[in-house]
Amino acid sequence: MKVLVIPDIHLKPWMFQRAAKIMEQGTAERAVCLMDIPDDWNQEYNINLYVETFDAAIAFAKKYPETLWSFGNHDLCYIWDERESGYSVPAAEIVPKKIEELERALPKGNEIRYVQKIDQVLFCHGGIADDFLRKALPFVKYDDVDEVVSQINGLSREHMWNDISPIWHRPQYAVARMYQPTEILQVVGHTPVKEIYREGNVISCDVFSTY
């Protein structure tokens, strides 16, 4: 299956327009969005851009209902009331409402999750570190990938709002072992990179964000 990965959005509604063209051309059979839909540098007061970007995401979700969505730290910081770089106080009310609207646009059984899985590929915002898994879920069946994904998706803010969680981890800068390094491929965003590349079992694709 050919999958289109839509990396971190950060208030760029045109990314969904470009993704829609790719889908219309039949280049990919399915899409996965790594989210971080809100926030960009010096855009905290541009509420219209927040609305426009979320509306573009919602329209894409309705047009391509099989698209999978993975929460980013910038999405969750509004839900969990955590202040993140670029956090917009003026947008603090509209972002959770728009996320709820996006959730309502998705078909039943296709909820926004921390981790999504297609075949032997895991999609999440930051990446699943082996150390995180063993600390957060010490009794999970390590080799049962479906169970691991299910258990991670059930974790609370307490487990997820830290530097090694799947929404925060940066394997590009860390030497930590990743989950199932020889059996599973992970596709991640979160950390801006100049070009898409693979290192070990991790493909990094956040090429539209800025430092």
Which residues are covered by each model-predicted region?
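Active-site neighborhood of phospho(di)ester-bond hydrolases with catalytic His/Asp-centered motifs
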Residues: 6-7, 31-36, 68-73, 123-124, ...
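Core catalytic region of metal-dependent phosphoesterases/phosphodiesterases
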Residues: 6, 11-97
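Active-site-proximal loop/helix segment associated with metal-binding centers of metalloenzymes
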Residues: 90-108, 112-180
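Conserved beta-sheet core of the metallophosphoesterase superfamily
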Residues: 167-211
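Flexible, charged surface loops at secondary-structure boundaries
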Residues: 24-27, 62-63, 117, 177-182, ...
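Short, basic, glycine/proline-bearing loop/turn elements
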Residues: 1-5, 38-43, 155-163
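Short catalytic/ligand-binding loop motif for oxyanion handling, primarily in non-cytosolic enzymes
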Residues: 40-42, 76-81, 124-126, 130-134, ...
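Beta-strand-turn-beta hairpins that frame and shape the catalytic cleft
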Residues: 1-4, 116-123, 198-201
